[in-house]
């Protein structure tokens, strides 16, 4: 029996679990377009999908914000139908042998800062900035970074008066412990600074392959989060960023220096990385690391290693020799229109494949490729949701019992 929602969308197979709900592949039967359908049981103890859909609607029109096509109730479920997206940055990171080149990290950083800035401009903070919640588009939007999952988002100021929420302590740890800011670990109410600090850890994760506080063992989940917090606080930023351009340490130091209700200087942070990008002689061609690799399930570890070495070699040779050796700019770099990258949607003349992997249909979709790079999955869902690997909780700094959020562990 064919299942439909909104009398227009055919429900397909389950492709994962996002925040507070399951996600299915769907089809808009009026035009034959594939969509993502998020379902939440109306009888759930703490319904969130309606709230999340309202936040998505407030965000509509922003670059890198998924389009919401329909919201409503169908039988025993709350439903949100949205634009189908490509793989998450976590999936692509795994596909690239868990190491991104500096060029790819900087291309991503520019767009990710802008996504966070846009959400903040709409009076919300995301509170769960992590690679799983940034997805690439499909087709002509294959170079565009999207931000998803507003299940933990919170309004930080009044939309009319811009009155900031008050400073509070003893708050639950909301989000993902691996990328949580120091102040979040300390139980301080989150604000704009925390989203940006989390992004700094994401960027270093892309550089390093893993963060120093990953893989810590503990008898209980509470003790594990305490160990993550202790390790994070005892690791100086300069040590975390050692061996990488100083801009990454500058970024994190800037974020940690912000006061609770400060408005971050997003332009400064973007320009910090743009100046580094230009000094490295990189080109805004939107050729990411994954565009230079062979897609498919039969790629061996040796092939992946060889491709990564060849990619790094190509990157070194593609740099503009005239740009080498230019000293770092002194003081804060000021935003300049000349230094801004072109829109990711602008077609480029290079021959590399700069879109997300091509859509596949029928029997091809059922093949178990190493990182699910087809249109069916991942879609608006984190790879860690699909595999159940998370360092996430809503853990109160003053509670003995630990109420966990939608991410499980």
From Swiss-Prot:
PTM note: Autophosphorylated on serine and threonine residues.
Stated regulation of activity: Exhibits substrate-dependent heparin activation.
Disordered: annotated span: 300-409
Domain Protein kinase: 9-277
Record field: catalytic activity: L-seryl-[protein] + ATP = O-phospho-L-seryl-[protein] + ADP + H(+); L-threonyl-[protein] + ATP = O-phospho-L-threonyl-[protein] + ADP + H(+)
Protein EC: 2.7.11.1
The UniProt record lists the keyword Transferase: yes
SMART domains found in the cross-reference section: S_TKc
Keyword Glycoprotein: no
Active site: 128 (proton acceptor)
Complexes and interactors: Monomer. Interacts with per1 and per2. Component of the circadian core oscillator.
Protein name (Swiss-Prot/TrEMBL): Casein kinase I isoform delta-B
Lineage start: Eukaryota, Metazoa, Chordata, Craniata, Vertebrata
Gene for this chain: csnk1db
